[in-house]
Amino acid sequence: MNQKLVDALWKLQVDPSNTPNAEVIKQNISAEEGQWIQLEILERWLNDGKTLGGWKIGMTSGESRDALGPGVRPFGFLLKERLLNNRAQIIRDQLYRGGVENELCFFVGPSEGSDETDGGLPNIAGCAAGFEINQKRLPPGCPAGVRVGDNLSNWGVVAGHAVEVPKNLEDLSVTLFKTEPGRRGKELEIGRVKSNDHIDDHFDSLRVLAARLEAFGHRLQEGQWVITGAYEKHPFEVAHFRGHFDLEIGDVEVSLTSTQQ
C-alpha cells in the first residue's frame, strides 16, 4: 500500500487546511487501490476512538455518474459521530470548503431475512430525507482513485424522520431550499431534481453496495445509515437549508451557523 499517500490523506482528514505534497496527492492510482487506502483511513479513525456508522455508494448521479467507468460504483464510510439528527446546527467554519447535498438516507434493519449474500437486497428498515455534508479536502485535479481514498469527500450526514421505503422511488422528486440570515424567513428555492434519468435505481445501489462491501471484507450492519447519491446541491454558506422529498418521505433541515447556537 502507498503509505505516503495514506499519511497525506489522513492529515487532510484531521485538518483539511493542510497543504499536501502535490506529487504525493496527485498520483494516478486505480479506484481499487483507492478503496483499500480509504479502508486504511477508516482504520485510523477507529483507532482514534471513532465508530463506524454506515456507508455511502458513490458515482451514482448527475455529472459524477460513471466518472470511473460504466457501472463502477466505489463506496465510502460514514462516521457515527457525524450522523446528525434533523435540524442539526453546524458551525460553518469548521467545515472548510464543500457543500450540502440532498440524498435519500436508508436505515439498515436486522440481517434476518436479508439475501444480500446472494446479490439480493439488504434488509432495509426505513428511509428518510437527508443531507450529505461534503468537505472538499483535496486540491483540484486529483485523480479519481485518490478521491476514493479520500472517502469521496464525505464529512457527515443529516437525516430526517424515518418512514417506510416507497416502492416507486424512480418517481421521487427532491427540492432544495435555503433561508439566508437577515431575509426575515424568506425561503428561496435552489433547485428541484427528479430521480428518473438522474440517479441509479436506489434498490440496485443497495445491492451493489452490499456486494462491494463483501468483496472488501465488510458488510452492512443493523442500525447503520446508507446514502445512495446526490440530488440537488449547494456550496457551504451561513444559511438554513431544507430539503423536501415527495412520496410522503418528508423534509430534512440543517443550519450552517457563524457561531455555536
Question: Where do the protein language model's features map onto the residues?
Answer:
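Catalytic-core "active-site belt" of small-molecule-metabolizing enzymes
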Residues: 2-207, 235-242, 247-260
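A conserved acidic, glycine/proline-rich C-terminal tail/linker
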Residues: 202-238
